[in-house]
């Protein structure tokens, strides 16, 4: 049994959306009948809302986007429900915001709900709750959401369906010398691609940059990621059965556990701690906790046990973790504590994730 997370982008749901969804439903149903479990992350609510409201283009204000999403979401779910019912299968709507996942208990509740739906043989259909998401707590795109969902449910495979056939060394639409990339054994090696990966089209928000970011999140959690051409819905059945195509991002050999994945990718840092070189070496090479004596400066205002960014002396991100003290306590103690033996722990190693492992 394979647990799949499948992500459908907005660009794939243009035109005759009902017929397109019926085509994808056949592939999803075939995998579920075979004994696999599938979670679907779908875009399309805003686009369908724009169609229903006869808008000439995607809105450019938050309020208008949220209103379009609210209009289109019910219609989107009705299409999936009808399409899967033909195959005798049920669907469940799950709308998420980042705030649902930032809280550890709610994160576990969301994971448990999805696991129960899968155990019942139901297809969870997930979308960001665009009608309610605030700007500072948005996933921003469903590529990121699909990667976080894959980590939360312990998926084996994440399939990102898009309107290109694979990853290229540069944009093949503008560069005739662009080379296809079929396998990526560590997505961080492709950071240089992100600068030219491109933004989403007129109706979408997820260009290749967000797909590379999603691949890094998922592979860090032990999930194999497939980037494949989804423009022909009939291809989905074969892709879920193991057909090679597109680009495969292989999982990290030492994947993060559930909690560390949550720390690294879900939490939004509320402040920063700047570290000296000795503290950086202790974290990187000795697996130590961060002591206050290794902190040179604190930025931002945050309460105790909230997520913070850790920066090395060059200002580069070293990692993330939960700070045991609030920002004022850290500031007050910086001028007092100079002895490592008397220095309190400000980020315990069990609540710390390094950027490059």
Curated annotation (Swiss-Prot):
Its EC number is 2.7.2.11. InterPro entries: AceGlu_kinase-like_sf, Asp/Glu/Uridylate_kinase, G5K_ProB, Glu/AcGlu_kinase, Glu_5kinase, Glu_5kinase/COase_Synthase, Glutamate_5-kinase_CS, PUA. It comes from the Bacteria. It is found in: Cytoplasm. Residues 270-341 form the PUA domain. PROSITE patterns: GLUTAMATE_5_KINASE, PUA. One of its GO terms (cellular component) is cytosol. Its main location: cytoplasm. Pathway: Amino-acid biosynthesis; L-proline biosynthesis; L-glutamate 5-semialdehyde from L-glutamate: step 1/2. Pfam families: AA_kinase (PF00696), PUA (PF01472). CDD domains: AAK_G5K_ProB, PUA_G5K. GO terms for molecular function: ATP binding; glutamate 5-kinase activity; RNA binding. GO terms for biological process: L-proline biosynthetic process. The keyword Transferase applies. NCBIfam families: proB. HAMAP family: ProB. Catalyzes the transfer of a phosphate group to glutamate to form L-glutamate 5-phosphate. Belongs to the glutamate 5-kinase family. This is Glutamate 5-kinase. The gene is proB.
């Amino acid at each position: 049994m394979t647990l799949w997370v499948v992500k459908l982008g907005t660009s794939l749901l243009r035109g005759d959306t009902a017929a397109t969804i019926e085509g994808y439903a056949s592939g999803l149903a075939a995998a579920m009948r075979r004994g696999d479990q599938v979670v679907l992350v779908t875009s399309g609510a805003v686009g369908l809302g724009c169609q229903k409201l006869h808008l000439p283009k995607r809105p450019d204000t938050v309020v208008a986007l949220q209103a379009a999403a609210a209009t289109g979401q019910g219609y989107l779910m009705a299409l999936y429900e009808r399409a899967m019912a033909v195959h005798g299968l049920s669907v469940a709507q799950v709308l998420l915001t980042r705030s649902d996942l930032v809280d550890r208990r709610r994160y576990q509740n969301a994971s448990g709900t999805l696991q129960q739906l899968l155990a019942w043989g139901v297809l969870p259909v997930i979308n960001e709750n665009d009608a309610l998401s605030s700007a500072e707590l948005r996933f921003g795109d469903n590529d990121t959401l699909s990667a976080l969902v894959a980590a939360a449910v312990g998926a084996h495979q994440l399939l990102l369906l898009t309107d290109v056939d694979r990853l290229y060394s540069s944009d093949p639409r503008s560069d005739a010398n662009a080379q296809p990339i079929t396998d990526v054994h560590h997505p961080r090696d492709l950071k240089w691609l992100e600068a030219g990966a491109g933004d989403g089209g007129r109706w979408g928000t997820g260009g290749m940059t967000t797909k590379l970011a999603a691949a890094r999140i998922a592979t860090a959690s032990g999930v194999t990621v497939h980037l494949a051409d989804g423009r022909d819905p009939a291809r989905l059945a074969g892709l879920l059965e193991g057909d090679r195509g597109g680009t495969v991002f292989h999982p990290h050999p030492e994947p993060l556990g559930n909690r560390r994945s949550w720390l690294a990718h879900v939490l939004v840092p509320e402040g920063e701690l700047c570290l000296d070189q000795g503290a950086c070496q202790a974290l990187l090479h000795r697996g130590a906790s961060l002591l206050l004596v290794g902190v040179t400066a604190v930025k931002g205002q945050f309460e105790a046990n909230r997520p913070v960014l850790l920066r090395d002396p060059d200002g580069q991100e070293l990692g993330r973790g939960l700070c045991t003290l609030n920002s004022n306590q850290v500031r007050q103690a910086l001028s007092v504590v100079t002895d490592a033996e008397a220095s309190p722990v400000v980020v315990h190693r069990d609540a710390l994730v390094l950027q490059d492992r």
